[in-house]
């Protein structure tokens, strides 16, 4: 991964549910300074949020799986029920995907028909993606429910120069894994177009460690983006996504196989209007997920979401800016034809004030009015102080919530009178840069959740769990360039997550990731990465330790021309046998080769 941590300092991170997303779509190149840690833009040095960025090179190194690329970031871990296509959860600061918002080109893609509203990262492939941005900490004041741990924003491929352009990638590797992706686009002063197609297929390996048969995965996907500048003041656009995949899995420990077909589709249309000091953005989006398991207890899960949103912003003074908006969301779930639905209307605002050049303050407030239970207030305050030209201190405090899912409220095991889970989070970080060669960063975090919703065996239904769930820890990261050709990056995370004093399952206490990037020649580059995970508990009922493990990955890339490169990736070089979920396999030693051409 080429200097990921240093790029976290330099890359743009387009981040906002509306205007920020729209403006990121306007920006063709990665701006070196501008970020969105809230509704209003700011510089990376001035944001109080902790933001991580994966660009297309990082995603390529992670292979077809976006989850594998995310898992090497500080504060992030992965739990997977097998290989590509199986159920996989990304944990951020000890909290699983239930508490993580996910958006693709401004479209919310978490599944309303899931047991808990969440996104399955096991089926997210990297072929059509250009950038993945993670903003950590409770973000309910910005994004509403399901953002207690943070939000992941995904942007698909975009043209980076005027005229017609594109990119094609072909890859083949272990487990008979085949990947093909093609993107084409066009841009000029008024129009931007992008269209991407991707196909991934693999024979895979057995998901369960007790079985022997392979569990394969195949998926086709497409993404589209178009925007047109109608006048100097009005811009309109649309983004869309579609995927159709089939995942094989093990139903039991006795070679009992099964498969799930999932079709996802989404569409978003937006209009941006500029009026002097004012900016307005109107958008409507829809998302649908259709999962089918012919032999499952529940065979068909259909989840739908419709959302309408307005966001406005204005610069009140040279030091103060205000953003505000409203949105309406309706979610529906159908389980074998039995339908449930719920809606909410929200109002939100953010104010940002910079009393002096080295200090920026921001505050957010949001109110959600739900159709099924009492409304919820959530808030966030953040501060960034540039103590010196090389040192930045940032901190944030937020309150949030997770509304019970449609399945938890209305499904076959629904609980009576479920209330939203509520949370509080705090983080404090210091970042220091040593010239152009090195960076060090330390961030302490604390998140607690009350009214946790879990399945109760005593009542055979979902119920609120007494006590408090708390996750606390420390993230350390850094990078150092020994020369123009050799650099080092690394991060370590300590996490202690407990519910009423009992450790949570599948949360590593220790995670370490180190990488060395070496440009052998002007055309040949290589990356060696070592990842170590220790002290993880898992099990059913009684939690017992999983074995600690160390995984070594090696990759190399050769530039055939200025726009074409060939690459090879050797993953799990030492053929380490390990589990991230008890009883489920992970990949053994695997080799992948590919070629990528820009035109």
Label each region the model flagged.
Residues 231, 271, 284, 315-323, ...:
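Structural signature of Gram-negative outer-membrane beta-barrels, strongest in the C-terminal barrel
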Residues 140-141, 153-155, 159-163, 169-171, ...:
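Periplasmic-side early beta-strands and strand-to-turn transitions of outer-membrane beta-barrels
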Residues 30-61, 89, 223:
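N-terminal periplasmic "start-of-domain" segments of outer-membrane beta-barrel proteins
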Residues 66-69, 88-91, 100-103, 119-124, ...:
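N-terminal periplasmic accessory domains that precede
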Residues 108-136:
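Short acidic/polar hinge/loop motifs at secondary-structure boundaries
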Residues 36, 67, 71-108:
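Extracytoplasmic beta-strand/coil segments of soluble accessory domains associated
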Residues 254-274, 301-304, 371-372, 390-392, ...:
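Outer-membrane beta-barrel signature, preferentially recognizing the C-terminal barrel domain
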Residues 354-356, 361, 446-448, 465-539, ...:
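Gram-negative outer-membrane beta-barrel transporters
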